[in-house]
Amino acid sequence: MMAGATFALWVIYGNIFVISDTLVIGILFVSGIFTLLFLVVGASTEAPDNPTVIDWTLSLLSAACGIYFFLKAQVIADRISLLEPLTPLQLFFGSALLVLTLEATRRTTGMGLTAVVVAFLLYNLFGYLLPAPFGHGVSSYTYVLDVLVFTTDGLFGVPIQVVASYVFLFVLFGTLLAKAGGGDFFFNLASALTGKTRGGPAKVAVISSGLYGTMSGSATSDVVTTGSITIPIMRRLGYTRRFAGGVEVAASTGGSSMPPIMGSAAFILAEYTGVPYREVVYVAIIPALLYYFGVFGQVHLRAVREDLRPVSGSVPTLGTTFRLGWMFVIPILVIISVLMIGYSPTYTAAIGAASVVVAAALSTLTRMSLWQIVEALGETTLRILPVAGACAAAGLVIGGLSMTGLGMKAANVIIAVSGGDPILTLLLAAVITIILGLGMPTPSAYILAAVLVAPAMTRIGFPLLESHLFLLYFAIMSALTPPIAVAAMAAAAIAEEDPFKIAFDAVRLAIVGFLMPFVFLWNPAILAIGSVPEIILTVVGAVAAVAALAVAVEGMLERQVPRLERVGLLVGAIVAVAPQTLIAVAGIASIAILIGRRLYRDPSVVKGDETQSGSDGVECGVCGPRAICEPADPPEVPEAKER
């Protein structure tokens, strides 16, 4: 813990007070992370908390590499890459760092990403044996090592630089906020807003997981953290195991698309596109809100379909929630304000982290002790380990791609296969990005897609920012997409259900996330790009489309919706987001007529949030959600049967 806290303090000091070149920052960060990583994430699964001789050896070798590269940083920076031969010491330490990166990747992310990196390394070395269009010139081992380790195009390139600066500081912000009690505040806020409505616990999961996910940036971490609370509650309410897990997975996965933080991949997107991070946040707001509106709507309609009315019980009120946790709103407002003023993400994150400590000190209930701050620093370092390992590996891939030109070759192949057709190109881009993201962290999936797929999209005319945001969305969605669906696997352990069943329910709940990228490339006004009237009409149309999609998917309002009407709603949803004004208005009107007609027939749909509990009874999990039993003493509610 103390070693991690010390490292975190160095990162803060280096980013805020020391101006240094990117090579030195990358060298010190990578070597420091690896030194800790091999001691924390052990090679032995039998005794992970007891480092072996191998672990200590790798840790010391990481430190030695860091010392050598730091002492020789100026020599490395001054040498002419690919022309001046590497010295024996450079060959040794460069090779050692390459092997250490592969092992660090294996320990933090598993064999999936490690196999990808090894495959690209083999391609760099032996790709000259392949026929056109994928063959390249002969590359010796020293040539490959020179590019990957001794320049800022490989290991010490953009991904690791981003992690070493503002990603680390934003993770610190989230960790401090959680340590001070911000996580409880957000959960209580979600409970106060939706706890007494139909399907309340599931709606609490949607809101709280979204709020937590924007800070963590990891769907799996979010599922484990919030799902351990929300999934059992949803089960007791009457949701099936698979649906409860699916709700948590869909809500947690979307957190990486929710401003203002959006996880680490969004920072990398800003670096690759050259677009200020505040602009990335600005254009991502409407799609993220629509995503959660879609999940929220399906959760409510499922509660209607299953007749899962609210259960009586203690739910925090808004007044109590804000009275005890109002100070946690301050850091969020600080982050947003500083970003909008124009400060860099690094300074924004640092100021935000400091504001958490200051805001928490405003109440004796939330005031942080020195030891809690030290714990938060140490936990930040631990949480950054898998991200750093993945981004270091991604740096090796990017270096190899730039060296061999594979990125442009892949773009040529995509365009050739699609024939330059925009729709087919987008479908190929979506499928490739999801495949690249299966079992991999979102940053790695996005980076690979940005290098391999984005050039094809921009070459046929799609705008740069929208193209990269398209790829980011599908990199995020890969976390819940079968057959791997790492977030669903995490939920399966909590829900005690087949991860494939959870994943399929999560995909249905997250359907807006799969469709939204196509929509904002078709109609950029949904990204708040364009005139105010265009944006307003598009937002209204998108809200109507998402509502129609939720009804069509669940087939429910207060009663079953006939198939023909569901088809009509799907068609209306497509038309409502069209960039042409008259067509969009026609789509909105058709949705309003279909849903309004159904609501007029079934007016009870708007009255369905009464608590299902009589004055003397409680809901019985044995008799079913419609039954009201009258025991002498309120019993403990047994777990509901599977539906």
Regions picked out by a protein language model, each given a short descriptive name:
Residues 187-255, 261, 265-268, 274, ...:
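Hydrophobic transmembrane alpha-helices that form the pore/transport pathway of multi-pass ion
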Residues 64, 103, 108, 118-123, ...:
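Core transmembrane alpha-helical segments of multi-pass membrane transporters/permeases
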Residues 106, 174-178, 209-218, 250-256, ...:
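Transmembrane alpha-helix interface/packing and boundary motifs in multi-pass membrane proteins
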Residues 44-47, 68-83, 108, 128-138:
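Transmembrane alpha-helix boundary signature
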Residues 617-632:
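Cysteine-cluster motifs in flexible loop/terminal segments that predominantly coordinate metals
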Residues 87-92, 153-166, 193-205, 237-243, ...:
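Membrane-interfacial loop-to-helix junctions in multi-pass transporters
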Residues 2-5, 24-38, 54-63, 91-100, ...:
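Hydrophobic mid-bilayer segments of alpha-helices in multi-pass membrane transport proteins
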